[in-house]
């Protein structure tokens, strides 16, 4: 399930574009997540009241959380699968405090792919998309394994 060096390079190349403007990418990812899967909004007390895309775009809190999410994910992706130290506290908080089901990690992975396709159509071709999907699947599988260790059946 691991990625080749070439695949990791594709992932990190596109991630460089994300890091050039994390706030707008994070906002795009979260809006895509909430529009595609409105049930995920229920896990976010500070966003539950946001009903329209315009309200979401106007929310500084949402933008700030998008930065938090993508900054954490970027730190994990840069480890090229050697992300145990970064993953452990994330799995702990998402399993025990936030109670985020693994399925929701799949939903946000799809939202990340969608946001990258939308924002970087010329730089996110089939090879880069395939590599990013593999990297996000590796992340999700490792999160699921940590959830299991913590006794969370999310």
Curated annotation (Swiss-Prot):
GO terms for molecular function: heme binding; metal ion binding; nitrite reductase activity; oxygen binding; oxygen carrier activity; peroxidase activity. Keywords: Cytoplasm, Heme, Iron, Metal-binding, Muscle protein, Oxidoreductase, Oxygen transport, Phosphoprotein, Transport. Its EC number is 1.7.-.-, 1.11.1.-. O2 binds at residue 65. Nitrite binds at residue 65. Heme b binds at residue 94. InterPro entries: Globin, Globin-like_sf, Myoglobin. The keyword Cell membrane does not apply. It comes from the Eukaryota. Residues 2-148 form the Globin domain. It is found in: Cytoplasm, Sarcoplasm. Pfam families: Globin. GO terms for biological process: removal of superoxide radicals. The modification Phosphothreonine is found at residue 68. GO terms for cellular component: extracellular exosome; sarcoplasm. Its main location: cytoplasm. The modification Phosphoserine is found at residue 4. It catalyses: Fe(III)-heme b-[protein] + nitric oxide + H2O = Fe(II)-heme b-[protein] + nitrite + 2 H(+); H2O2 + AH2 = A + 2 H2O. Belongs to the globin family. PANTHER family: MYOGLOBIN. Marmoset, woolly monkey, and squirrel monkey have a minor myoglobin component that appears to differ from each major component in having Phe-Lys preceding position 2. Monomeric heme protein which primary function is to store oxygen and facilitate its diffusion within muscle tissues. Reversibly binds oxygen through a pentacoordinated heme iron and enables its timely and efficient release as needed during periods of heightened demand. Depending on the oxidative conditions of tissues and cells, and in addition to its ability to bind oxygen, it also has a nitrite reductase activity whereby it regulates the production of bioactive nitric oxide. Monomeric. This is Myoglobin. It comes from Lagothrix lagotricha.
């Amino acid at each position: 399930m691991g990625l080749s060096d070439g695949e990791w390079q594709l992932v990190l190349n596109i991630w460089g574009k994300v890091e050039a403007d994390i706030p707008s990418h994070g906002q795009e990812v979260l809006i895509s997540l909430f529009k595609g899967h409105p049930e995920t909004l229920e896990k976010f007390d500070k966003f539950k009241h946001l009903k329209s895309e315009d309200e979401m775009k106007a929310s500084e809190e949402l933008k700030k959380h998008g930065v938090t999410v993508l900054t954490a994910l970027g730190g994990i992706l840069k480890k090229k699968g050697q992300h145990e130290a970064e993953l452990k506290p994330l799995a702990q908080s998402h399993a025990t405090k936030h109670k985020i089901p693994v399925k929701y990690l799949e939903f946000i992975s799809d939202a990340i792919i969608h946001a990258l396709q939308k924002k970087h159509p010329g730089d996110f071709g089939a090879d880069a998309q395939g590599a990013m999907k593999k990297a996000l699947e590796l992340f999700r599988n490792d999160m699921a394994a940590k959830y299991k260790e913590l006794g969370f059946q999310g």
